[in-house]
């Protein structure tokens, strides 16, 4: 019974200790078994002593307290163990190489020691069958510490991967390749790890991205922005510009969304002044531009409005008597001088320029002489002149060869923000520096928007290289915009005029020559010009409401309200607007509600509290005082104040006097006109008695609220201070208003007694105790009980 209990206890002890404890139990069992031959016992003892020496050499093999030693060894074992098996594939390549070298060295060192042990292990199978825990773990104890669950992953060199990518690939393709590599690595590494479940928000975001991509693919087919049609006519095929590589490309964002990246228009002076290295424009290039307007180079993005209506989605229709209704908007893109080859992602991201109320930059042949007098940079003070050279008989090739427009050397990205009025004008009607004549504005306002007719009547405007610097200097004198944007604006305007080269049979070339001493006029027009008034019905947003005069709030007031009141309902005006704007520009104008009060006998004595305020607020102005109505003559207007003075006998004896003497009676009763508190009864304003009248501000005799109220500063200065060390505040004199500052300083110097230097004199008046001995010590806080 006791033997069985001790055996079970020993088995249980060997269950928790896998190492040397299981060997002890096996040795005890082998001693108790009489059927085991002596040869096998010797071999097992030899093998166990050798393994005990290799695994735990500090424990003697035959010590009586062997279990205690093994228990203490098992407690201290975690301090000597190796680190946990790390399966992170993103370890450094150096660490993984070092670990693999150490592993091979330890295997080579331990392989020599275990050659004899493996030979004895083959003969030891019969003795180890009795205990299931004494498998090959004891013999391979040194191997179990070093052996990993799987070999470390091969080192990855990301630099060699990124350098192997060709130069013509975009950043989008590089990021997609890197993401696919990371995803494959993450899938293989998280085989035995927990996977984070995707939330509903992430699934919704993915669904939205898929929808945006599908919408982008479907809308991209409608936009004819394919650059492969005219690739054979290009003389040079440039690489991808640097601006596209520098721009952060947002994936899964549609090209029409407001989140798409737009590079700011910041151009250095060097890029403006240097000659562009573009190719010469051929004559077939001009014909090709008029035929195919869909090739785009410059990137235009439109800001999305808060109401959801965009300028791109609007198709304004203008009425023309001759040609009927025509669309006021038409899309075309600028000609590309940089080919991207087979890059389809950037070609699909190009935006067409939408020009509303397109204006001819030149005049027709009939109005050439009239346009000379009206257009151009003309200044009366500087007496600038314009050389207008038009050769009617010359062909297009001669015009192109004499002066050819410069193609832009870099890709421009524009941001159209003013979506309500997308037509922009350089100057106004009063400005003589306009580049267009009246005929172009008349055609623009009448609504004739035919692409072929416009381009046939157009004439290219190009500025020579010599005059570009003068235009830059002239624009620098203009103070409307910042200096950083002036060069970029001129560059964009110049490139627009150069790239919009029309195909026409009669090609007229205008060369504007500006002297170096000419300063451009700089008028600042706050009022809307005639130009914007003409084109306003074309550029106004389409609305299904009736077009009657509604006193709506202006956009300036709405901006101010949004600025000052973040949660504004557009019904309250900002605080710093004038009163006229506050009263006349509100959507809901309050009207005076006329209420006739039936005062009962209970309400007569009420002269205080909230009931009086309600009575004052409900009373309206005295309508009988106008005197315009005819039926007011028979009505008796009772003045209770005058009756009260008559009752007290304060009225003058000359009550009924003639009109000549009426002025004296009015002067005698002037005090009745300004009764304090009477404004509350004659107006709708309850707070009228507290407000000062305009006439009383300058009067000295009248006592008003501002005269009687003492400010906090003067009150704190005049208060009597007790318990402070600063007792000189009594001697401080107030600064009067009728004397000068020097008199104040002299009076202050007389009041302050200061110690003077000793003077050697025989005069007895000088010797004074206060001067010789000083004031002495005085107690600042004397005790209340004098001793």
From Swiss-Prot:
It is found in: Cytoplasm. Residues 36-54, 130-142 have a biased composition (Polar residues). The modification N-acetylmethionine is found at residue 1. One of its GO terms (cellular component) is cytoplasm. Its main location: cytoplasm. Residues 170-184 have a biased composition (Basic and acidic residues). Residues 160-169, 218-230 have a biased composition (Low complexity). The keyword Acetylation applies. Residues 1-115, 130-200, 217-238 are annotated as: Disordered. The modification Phosphoserine is found at residues 63, 254, 313, 342, 345, 390, 477, 492, 546, 683, 699. Keywords: Acetylation, Cytoplasm, Phosphoprotein. Present with 155 molecules/cell in log phase SD medium. This is Uncharacterized protein YDR239C.
């Amino acid at each position: 019974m006791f033997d069985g209990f001790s055996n079970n206890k020993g088995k249980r002890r060997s269950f928790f200790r896998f190492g040397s404890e299981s060997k002890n139990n096996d040795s005890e069992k082998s001693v108790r078994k009489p059927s085991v031959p002596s040869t096998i016992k010797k071999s097992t003892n030899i093998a166990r002593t050798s393994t005990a020496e290799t695994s735990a050499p500090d424990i003697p093999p035959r010590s009586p307290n062997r279990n205690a030693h093994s228990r203490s060894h098992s407690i201290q074992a975690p301090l000597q163990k190796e680190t946990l098996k790390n399966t992170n594939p993103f370890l450094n390549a150096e660490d993984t190489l070092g670990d693999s070298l150490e592993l091979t060295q330890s295997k080579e060192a331990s392989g020599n020691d275990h050659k004899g042990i493996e030979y004895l292990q083959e003969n030891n199978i019969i003795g180890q069958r009795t205990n299931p825990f004494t498998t090959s773990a004891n013999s391979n104890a040194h191997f179990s510490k070093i052996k990993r669950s799987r070999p470390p992953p091969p080192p990855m060199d990301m630099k060699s991967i990124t350098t192997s990518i060709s130069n013509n690939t975009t950043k989008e393709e590089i990021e997609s390749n890197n993401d696919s590599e990371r995803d494959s690595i993450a899938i293989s590494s998280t085989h035995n790890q927990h996977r984070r479940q995707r939330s509903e928000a992430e699934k919704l975001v993915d669904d939205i991205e898929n929808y945006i991509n599908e919408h982008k693919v479907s809308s991209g087919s409608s936009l004819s922005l394919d650059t492969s049609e005219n690739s054979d006519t290009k003389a040079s095929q440039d690489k991808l510009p640097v601006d596209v590589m520098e721009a952060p490309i947002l994936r899964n964002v549609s090209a029409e969304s407001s989140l798409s990246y737009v590079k700011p228009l910041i151009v250095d002076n060097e890029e403006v002044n240097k000659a562009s290295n573009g190719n010469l424009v051929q004559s077939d290039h001009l014909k090709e531009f008029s035929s195919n307007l869909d090739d785009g180079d410059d990137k235009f993005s439109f800001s999305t409005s808060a109401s959801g209506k965009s300028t791109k989605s609007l198709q304004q229709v203008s009425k023309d008597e001759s040609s009927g209704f025509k669309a006021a908007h038409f899309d075309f893109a600028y000609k590309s001088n940089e080919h991207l080859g087979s890059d389809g992602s950037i070609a699909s991201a190009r935006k067409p320029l939408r020009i509303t109320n397109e204006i001819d930059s030149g005049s027709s042949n009939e109005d050439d002489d009239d346009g000379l007098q009206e257009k151009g940079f003309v200044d009366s003070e500087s007496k600038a002149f314009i050389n207008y050279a038009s050769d009617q008989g010359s062909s297009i090739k001669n015009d192109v060869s004499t002066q050819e427009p410069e193609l832009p050397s870099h890709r421009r990205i524009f941001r159209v923000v003013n979506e309500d009025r997308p037509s922009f004008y350089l100057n106004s009607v009063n400005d003589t520096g306009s580049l267009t004549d009246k005929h172009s504005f008349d055609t623009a306002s009448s609504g004739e928007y035919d692409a072929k007719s416009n381009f046939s009547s157009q004439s290219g405007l190009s500025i020579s290289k010599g005059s570009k610097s003068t235009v830059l200097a002239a624009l620098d004198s203009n103070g409307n915009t910042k200096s950083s944007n002036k060069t970029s604006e001129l560059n964009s305007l110049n490139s627009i005029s150069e790239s919009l080269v029309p195909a026409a049979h009669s090609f007229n070339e205008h060369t504007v020559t500006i002297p170096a001493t000419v300063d451009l006029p700089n008028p600042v027009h706050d009022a809307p010009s005639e130009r914007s008034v003409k084109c306003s019905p074309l550029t106004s947003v389409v609305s299904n409401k009736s077009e009657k005069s509604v006193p709506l709030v202006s956009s300036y007031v709405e901006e101010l309200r949004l600025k000052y009141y973040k949660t504004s309902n557009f019904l309250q005006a900002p605080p710093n607007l004038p009163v006229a704007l506050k009263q006349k520009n509100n959507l809901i104008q309050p009207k005076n509600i006329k209420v006739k009060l039936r005062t009962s006998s209970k309400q007569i004595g009420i002269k205080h509290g909230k009931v009086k305020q309600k009575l004052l607020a409900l009373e309206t102005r005295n309508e009988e005082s106008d005197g315009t109505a005819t039926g007011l003559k028979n009505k008796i207007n009772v003045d209770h104040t005058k009756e009260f003075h008559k009752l007290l006998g304060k009225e003058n004896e000359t009550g009924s006097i003639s009109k000549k003497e009426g002025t004296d009676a009015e002067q005698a009763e002037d005090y009745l006109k300004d009764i304090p508190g009477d404004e509350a009864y004659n107006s709708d304003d309850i707070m009228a008695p507290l407000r000062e009248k305009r006439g009383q501000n300058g009067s000295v005799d009248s006592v008003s609220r501002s005269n009687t109220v003492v400010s906090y500063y003067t009150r704190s200065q005049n208060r009597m201070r007790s318990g402070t060390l600063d007792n000189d505040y009594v001697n401080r004199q107030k600064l009067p208003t009728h004397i000068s500052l020097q008199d104040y300083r002299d009076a202050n110097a007389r009041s302050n007694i200061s110690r003077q230097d000793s003077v050697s004199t025989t005069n007895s008046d000088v010797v004074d105790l206060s001067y010789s001995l000083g004031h002495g010590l005085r107690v600042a806080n004397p005790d209340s009980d004098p001793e």
